A protein has these predicted regions:
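Glycine-rich P-loop/Walker A and Walker A-like loops and their local beta1-loop-alpha1 context
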Residues: 6-11, 16-46, 277-337
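Extended amphipathic alpha-helical coiled-coil/heptad-repeat regions
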Residues: 294-299, 331, 351-429, 439-440, ...
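P-loop NTPase motor core
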Residues: 126-203, 208, 377-454
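Hydrophobic/aromatic beta-strand patches that form the interior of the parallel beta-sheet core
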Residues: 23-25, 51-53, 190, 207-211, ...
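Conserved inter-motif catalytic segment of the P-loop NTP-binding fold
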Residues: 49-162, 325-413
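Phosphate-binding and hydrolysis-coupling loops of NTP-dependent motor/remodeling domains
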Residues: 206-281, 459-499
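Short glycine-/polar-rich loops that comprise or flank the Walker A/P-loop
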Residues: 20, 46-49, 186-187, 203-207, ...
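Conserved nucleotide-binding/hydrolysis micro-motifs of P-loop NTPases
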Residues: 31, 56-60, 160-161, 195-198, ...
Length: 499
């Protein structure tokens, strides 16, 4: 089953506010404008109260692409049949004037419709004689009229194509619908616009959303920009999004991650006799897990929230330790053993952290309470301080492979920028023992290029417009949105490809 998708909350709140509202959705071909329009009907809970006019795509094509639409929304394509009606509750002064001009042979291209004086008022109804030149708009008006006083959502995909079909400028059609539907009858209207960039039509709608497809590090990046929403506060105007699974999902940077009560880690088993799991199944699928005797590098931007880094190392440490194996850890940001214990011990049985984890700290940070788990870094000889035989001696009951999880921002702050050049003994020992080495670096780190040169797998994590993205440099992958699910009581990575 495809993912449910998600429209930015500001757009949903905009349409849910009292009164009528209009929104222009624009962007180049392939950016998801039709998907956005159709999905909006579902997220507003108004699928049955929506009228979709497709001027470019046949109903059959829509149903093939959006299977969930069938039996829920009946699109209306361009029509040739003529319809009439005896009375209408929906305001239609501007439409009647436009039809009148068409019947007189005029183009109907004035920017603003003139007031009309024809028609007869009967109670709360305005009865006028209909023209028969605009059957698609007539059908939309009749749909809305049949549901008054309830609100409906009318979607026109696209207003450019409808204008071409009629020989009427799109601006004129928007003005007519704005006056009749939005202002006169308090209905919601969405116009799909095929052009991108700033246009004079932007001034005619209450809101404007643009969709764009660009590149980030040679990978596809999709960006949704809320250019305006009249009367609606916009806290975050730009979202990354994906069309994965045929749905538009905007990644919410303000997403409320609610941790459940901490639970014991459920170990992810080895992928093979030569590869342990990272504890992060989506990453295992990309890189094939942690190959024994080899190096994995994570290049993590300083713009990435610290929680994301902590959940990443929590998953790796817990998955190794929960299987009775050993961990030697240099925390990022010159972190302490005490903080590492607080981070991961709630996901382990009592005593397992002390038995299977050793944390390297700068000598000045050593605490007596953590003397059993702390290994000191004196700051002069990194190969001696991180000597692998000492780690093995400290973890006599732990099974193999061990995990060496080392943050190079801390190592560089203790030993200097050339620290990695002095760690040949550590890398050689890990390789001989068939253990696994994971290094964290930042893009600015002097060790980044050298570590990535040693690594068989390189992941890069960054923050783009407030959303955290991940991609593989080795092996080469597309761009993913990275989020975390804590509902199970421990951190679980969720990757969504940006396609």
């Amino acid at each position: 089953m495809p993912p449910a998708g998600r429209i930015p909350r500001e757009v949903v709140e905009f349409f849910n506010a009292a009164g009528g509202h209009s929104l222009i959705v624009k962007g180049p071909a392939g950016t998801g404008k039709t998907t956005f329009a159709l999905q909006l009907t579902e997220e507003l809970g108004e699928v049955s109260a929506s009228h979709y006019l497709s001027a470019r795509v046949s109903d059959e094509s829509l149903f093939r692409q959006f299977i969930w639409l069938k039996e829920r929304l009946k699109p209306a394509g361009l029509q040739t049949g003529l319809k009439g009606r005896l009375g209408s509750k929906v305001a239609r002064n501007a439409l009647d004037q436009l039809e009148g001009k068409l019947m007189e042979g005029k183009e109907g291209d004035d920017e603003e419709p003139e007031a009309i004086g024809s028609g007869e008022v009967k109670g709360n109804f305005l009865e006028v004689t209909l023209g028969f030149d605009l059957p698609e708009l007539e059908a939309a008006y009749e749909f809305v009229d049949g549901r008054l006083p309830e609100r409906s959502l009318v979607l026109i995909d696209s207003i450019d194509a409808l204008g071409e079909h009629y020989g009427i400028p799109a601006a004129r059609l928007i003005t007519v619908l704005q006056k009749d539907m939005v202002e006169g009858s308090k209905q919601n209207v969405l116009y799909v616009l095929e052009s991108s960039g700033e246009t004079r039509l932007d001034y005619l709608g209450d809101g404007v959303v643009s969709l764009a497809s660009s590149e980030y590090q040679g990978r596809r990046l999709r960006v949704l920009t809320i250019e305006k929403l009249r009367g609606q506060q916009v806290q975050h105007h730009r979202y990354l999004y994906t069309l994965d699974g045929g749905r538009l999902t905007a990644f919410d940077i303000r997403e409320d991650i609610r941790p459940a009560r901490p639970q014991l880690w459920k170990p992810v088993k080895d992928l093979s006799k030569d590869a342990a799991s990272m504890g992060l199944e989506p990453l295992d699928r990309i890189a094939g897990g942690l190959s024994r005797g080899r190096v994995v590098a994570f290049e993590i931007s300083n713009a990435v929230p610290a929680d994301y880094v902590d959940w990443l190392r929590t998953a790796m440490i817990c998955n190794i330790v929960s299987q009775g194996r050993g961990v030697a850890h240099v925390p990022p940001r010159k972190g302490s053993a005490e903080f590492t214990r607080e981070l991961v011990s709630s996901h382990m049985p009592p005593g397992l952290f002390d038995a299977n984890v050793r944390v390297f700290e700068a000598a000045t940070l050593g605490l007596a309470d953590d003397s059993r788990v702390v290994l000191h870094m004196e700051g002069t000889n990194v190969d001696a301080d991180l000597k692998w035989s000492n780690v093995e001696f400290q973890l006599p009951k732990a099974e193999r492979p061990f995990l060496a999880l080392m943050a190079f921002d801390t190592l560089e702050s203790v030993y200097g920028e050339k620290v990695i050049e002095s760690m040949s003994g550590v890398f050689a020992s890990v390789r001989r023992a068939k253990d696994v080495f994971v290094g964290f670096v930042t893009p600015e780190s002097a060790s980044a290029a050298k570590l990535e040169n040693l690594a068989y797998a390189v992941f890069r994590i960054d923050s783009v417009n407030g959303s955290v993205v991940l991609y593989g440099q080795k092996p080469y992958t597309e761009l993913f949105n990275l989020s975390w699910d804590l509902s199970g009581g421990f951190p679980r990575a969720v990757l969504r490809p940006i396609v």
